[in-house]
């Protein structure tokens, strides 16, 4: 057990992205701000000029928004990143040879704390959304088909991989959601170009093992918000100029941590007996070294920004 509070005097909160989105919409509604939903063909344009704008279609009608700056918060598959010229942008990527099969179940979680399991059959994770909604994952091959996994098959495999005390007490039930997601690490540099600033998954992706995706998006927003505040209130562009550097410094540390968590707790197809011994030793060291636990804990709760 890694006591995050004792090791860092901080804690983590399980804050599902659905709930985050709901809360943000409620705040925006109270502020009477305008959100344009169901926009199509969104495209930032002229971001290398003093008059950038964004075009999009709404109900078949083309619209145009003039602006000072553009924040590209449109995710990994969004259009914003492609606006940066190929001669300027550089991408770094690691695709992992497995995925996560996850289910959402209207059952009480097996534990109030997250359980990470390294098993001969592969990784497993016991998580939660709330006291009546559980989220569980198991590692599967990339070519696995979701149709091959009945609820019962999933529960049987999960129980094999979890510690005995958890497997014996877990409450099973019908899944209300089931999916398989690939794992990858991805970073693009720079995270800004002229009047365009990439935020969150538009600029970087981490495997979910380290629980850093949303945490990184929030720190990007913090850096950009601080830069925008200085730009408009103090009329200085230093924050905007340094946005990419500041954000990437924290991004790469989270990329490293998520990579380490993934390689430590997953089984790789090409894993040799030597690799297995190294992995076993890594976990044993983590179990017995307070120094190692502190390194994991301070990264898991999120590095400062």
Tell where the protein language model's regions lie, with residue ranges.
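Active-site-adjacent segment of FAD-dependent monooxygenases/related oxidoreductases
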Residues: 1-31, 46-48, 255-258
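Short, solvent-exposed loop/helix junctions and linker helices
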Residues: 13-18, 148, 215-218
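Structured helix-beta-strand junction loops
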Residues: 30-31, 120, 194, 246
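C-terminal helical "tail/cap" subdomain of flavin- and related membrane-associated enzymes
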Residues: 211, 226-305
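Conserved FAD-binding catalytic core of PHBH/FMO-like flavoproteins
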Residues: 26, 33-183
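Short, histidine-centered active-site or binding-site loop motifs used for metal coordination
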Residues: 6-7, 138-142, 202-203
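Conserved mid-domain beta->alpha element of the FAD-binding
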Residues: 24, 71-72, 179-260
């Amino acid at each position: 057990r890694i006591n995050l509070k004792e090791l860092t005097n901080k804690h983590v909160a399980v804050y599902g992205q659905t709930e985050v989105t709901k809360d943000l919409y409620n705040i925006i509604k109270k502020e009477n701000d305008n959100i344009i939903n169901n926009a199509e063909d969104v495209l930032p344009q002229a971001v290398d000029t003093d008059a950038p704008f964004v075009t999009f279609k709404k109900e078949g009608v083309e619209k145009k928004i003039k602006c000072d700056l553009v924040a590209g918060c449109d995710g990994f598959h969004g259009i914003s990143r492609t606006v940066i010229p190929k001669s300027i942008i550089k991408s770094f990527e690691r695709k992992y040879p497995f995925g996560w099969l996850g289910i959402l179940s209207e059952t009480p979680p097996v534990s109030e704390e997250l359980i990470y399991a390294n098993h001969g059959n592969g990784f497993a994770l016991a998580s939660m959304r709330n006291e009546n909604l559980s989220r569980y994952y198991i590692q599967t091959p990339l070519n696995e088909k979701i149709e091959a996994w009945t609820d019962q098959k999933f529960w049987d495999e999960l129980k094999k991989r979890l510690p005995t005390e958890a497997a014996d007490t877990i409450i099973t039930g019908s899944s209300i959601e089931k999916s398989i997601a690939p794992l990858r690490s991805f970073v693009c540099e720079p995270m800004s170009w002229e009047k365009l600033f990439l935020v969150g998954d538009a600029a970087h992706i981490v495997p979910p093992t380290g629980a850093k995706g949303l945490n990184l998006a929030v720190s990007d927003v913090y850096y950009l918000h601080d830069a925008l505040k200085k730009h408009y209130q103090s009329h200085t562009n230093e924050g905007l100029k340094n946005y990419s550097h500041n954000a990437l410094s924290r991004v790469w540390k989270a990329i490293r941590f998520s990579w380490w968590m993934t390689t430590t707790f997953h089984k790789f197809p090409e894993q040799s007996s030597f690799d297995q011994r190294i992995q076993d030793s890594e976990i044993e060291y983590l179990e017995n070294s307070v120094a190692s636990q502190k390194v994991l804990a301070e990264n898991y709760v999120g590095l400062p920004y």
